């Protein structure tokens, strides 16, 4: 089925990998069908939202039957391009960056950190988790084609913008930013900010000032 993915709400698009992960677990356990209520309980998204999310893709289930796990898994694998690997570069091989390199999204068939960059001479020229670490000063020498469209930033905040400018000039299309810096990028660049300190502060605030019923 052909569809215009730009018409899918961004909130829905962000939930698709969550659904896909749960469906993989269901398939591995031998389950053949699942209801929206079961999905809701597993992924902690209300069933009405799940049905609305799925409705953007047409008739994925049947009333009274639920959803065929194999069909859904196949559908979302294709929708999320799980059979096509996207190479990623990582900038900053500190504690967080090193953890990413060792993990390297081994449970995600479609994403892989292909190379990393740092300024630490003790790390340059080594491999971490099987990923080569290059000199950040030679970024432009190593990223010479369009095969790596995504970058992960785990660098000090003060260096983030200048590195981002270089990545944009090299044709990077998306950045996952783990620095506190709010980066300026052209409109055609997709950037997701993940500030762990802010998320933690937000969690503590909600625990103190909101009841569980208000979440």
UniProtKB/Swiss-Prot annotation:
Major localization class: cytoplasm
Gene Ontology cellular-component annotations: cytoplasm
Keyword Repressor: yes
Entry keyword set: Cytoplasm, DNA-binding, NAD, Repressor, Transcription, Transcription regulation
Lineage top rank: taxon: Bacteria
Keyword hit for DNA repair: no
Subcellular location: Cytoplasm
SMART domains attached to this UniProt entry: CoA_binding (SM00881)
A single BP term in Gene Ontology: negative regulation of DNA-templated transcription
Binding locations of NAD(+): 92-97
Pfam families: CoA_binding, Put_DNA-bind_N
A molecular function (GO) term: DNA binding
DNA-binding region ranges: 18-57
Subunit text: Homodimer.
Family: Belongs to the transcriptional regulatory Rex family.
Functional description taken from the UniProt entry: Modulates transcription in response to changes in cellular NADH/NAD(+) redox state.
Official protein name in the record: Redox-sensing transcriptional repressor Rex
Source organism (scientific name): Bacillus licheniformis (strain ATCC 14580 / DSM 13 / JCM 2505 / CCUG 7422 / NBRC 12200 / NCIMB 9375 / NCTC 10341 / NRRL NRS-1264 / Gibson 46)
Gene: rex
């Amino acid at each position: 089925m052909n569809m215009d993915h730009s018409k899918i709400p961004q909130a829905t698009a962000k939930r698709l990998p969550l659904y896909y992960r749960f469906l993989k677990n269901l398939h591995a356990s031998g389950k053949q069908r699942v209801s929206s209520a079961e999905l809701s309980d597993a992924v902690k998204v209300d069933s009405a939202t799940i049905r609305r999310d799925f409705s953007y893709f047409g008739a994925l289930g049947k009333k009274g039957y639920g959803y065929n796990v194999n069909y859904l898994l196949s559908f979302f694998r294709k929708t999320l391009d799980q059979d096509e690997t996207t190479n990623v570069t990582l900038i900053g091989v500190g504690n967080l960056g090193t953890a990413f390199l060792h993990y390297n999204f081994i449970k995600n068939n479609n994403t892989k950190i292909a190379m990393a960059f740092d300024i630490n001479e003790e790390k340059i020229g080594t491999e971490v988790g099987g990923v080569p670490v290059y000199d950040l000063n030679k970024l432009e020498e190593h990223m010479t084609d369009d095969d790596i469209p995504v970058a992960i930033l785990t660098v000090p905040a003060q260096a983030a913008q200048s590195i981002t400018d270089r990545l944009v000039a090299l044709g990077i299309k998306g950045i996952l930013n783990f620095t506190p810096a709010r980066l300026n990028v052209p409109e055609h660049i997709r950037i997701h900010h993940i500030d762990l300190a802010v998320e933690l502060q937000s969690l503590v605030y909600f625990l103190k000032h909101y009841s569980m019923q208000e979440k």
